[in-house]
Amino acid sequence: MLKLKRITSVICSALLVLAIVGCSSDNFEPIPLTDDETEILAAMGDDVNVITDDDYSHTIIELQAHPGNYSGQVYQLEGVYTTESINGVDTSFVYRTLVHDGEKTICGLHLKYLEKEIPDGAWIRVTAIIGTEDYDGETCTVMEVVAVEALAEAGQSQLEWDGVGHQH
């Protein structure tokens, strides 16, 4: 559990600035799927686990806590896109802000192999294979991007949350 708290702390610290400033995709041009991405998604069919607003917090927390259980599975989710410098390397994330009893917590995942230029703060839909990566000796969950698009309209960047899995 201490490892999860440490990993979550690193991710939350990297994203905290954006939570304070706030984000929206109102000023961004949509970035559509490429033809290749569209073909790949069609081929995946029902093998994609779609994370909805209602199950976002529990699913992301579960993916972070037990990445090995989900490695190789395909997930799709929407959220705010950002990059942060971690150990001098620009690192991409998709996240949402969870609200519980007035307290806000950033909850998201690292994006790997993102080939498109997406502006910080854009609302994206990403489909990716769950993988793991070593970070300072800890196993972290990553989303190995298969397809990503920046959408014209943003969804809910803040979601109500029951606090289960909450880290202090």
Language-model segments: what does each one mean?
Residues 1-21:
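Sec-dependent bacterial lipoprotein signal peptides
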Residues 13, 19-168:
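OB-fold and OB-like single-stranded nucleic-acid-recognition modules
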